């Protein structure tokens, strides 16, 4: 398994993390088998959120872990997220602390390796976030902190008050959904890709040693579903097949390898409940696309080069 440096050289972690969003419908035995399958391939980093399956993803994962003596907590890296509530966002101190207690209870563990703030809260008071993080860090409940879907200035505002470094920003990124790189290459152009929606987020995170985690790595824009095999992206799928045949792997593997080829040293967050699909994604760690192949896929997705 290829490794990604987490934050400012905190530690190395697998370049492919197991996203648990779609695991809430698994039985405890199915979850146990899935966890073992991931660990056997070196994917010991598991990404949760308190809202996934209304908490069921964490609960079933925790039960499968707690009932299997062969699964050791120190062999897993557990990340979860909080801050999204029904109809609003809440990054208050009270809610963060309550959320983490619930997460730990459901996961049957006494600490999280990494806690992320799931979405920016327009009413956030960074002093409250800082106070919550201090309690969680000093009590040993959370070892590291980060954010998800945050812009650079939102991170700056939090970091002004938060004493612990924010080491991760989890954002959507795939071949079609790649404005993070498009606005950097279409600078000074009157094109849709030139619009900087994210405040130079990619460059900011690289400058500040914040690891970018890529969620929905196979998603089309506007939540239209997976682009693999989709009739909306015929040129991209054709190019994926050509390159996949060259490396004797699947198109899924090549689409994941495209993300890992970027020098920002990103970490992929999978979204699959399939062990075979997980294996295909992990296989991307053994593929290094050429510069030409990376750009061919980028252009095949409909992006422009000035």
Which residues make up each language-model segment?
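Beta/alpha (TIM)-barrel catalytic core signal, keyed to glycine-rich beta->alpha loops juxtaposed to Asp/Glu
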Residues: 126-306
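A structural motif
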Residues: 43, 109-112, 142, 166
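Hydrophobic faces of well-ordered beta-strands that scaffold small-molecule active sites
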Residues: 14-18, 46-48, 76-80, 115-117, ...
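N-terminal binding-site loop/beta-alpha segment at the start of enzyme catalytic domains
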Residues: 1-76, 138, 219-221
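Short, small-residue-enriched loops and turns at beta-alpha junctions
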Residues: 24, 54, 85-86, 119-124, ...
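Active-site mouth loops of central-metabolism enzymes
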Residues: 19-29, 82-94
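Short, acidic/polar
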Residues: 27-38, 91-107, 153-156
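Active-site groove signature of glycoside hydrolases
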Residues: 104-125
